[in-house]
Amino acid sequence: TPEHTARAKSILGPEKWLAVEQKVCLEESSSTARALGRAELERYLVLPNYRRCWLSLGFTEADLDDGGSDRFIDAMVVSGSMDQIQRRLDEHFDAGATHVCIQPVHPAGDLAAAERTLEAFAPG
């Protein structure tokens, strides 16, 4: 989240390079995007180190249970239009990120969707 980015930058200091990752789902249907996000995050939700980090960011156990609350999924996987997604990426830069790596979230096996997402947000 951009909040985590700001916390990391405050620890590293202004001169250090900070690369962060943001899961991106180029999908305007929130229910579809959340379903894809839940599938993507499922493996992380059982890992204690991830849960501790998310709890330290203000999420609750309830946010992390049962596949993740909508609030949690929306925070971890930005979705919507290109403009909506770009705003979240910009929030990371505003919070001190030097680089934001996007991780496409898409239907399993749909590499064309991943390529469309990467191309849409590629620099230059």
Enumerate the predicted regions with their spans.
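Active-site-adjacent structural elements that line small-molecule/cofactor binding pockets in enzymes
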Residues: 1-124
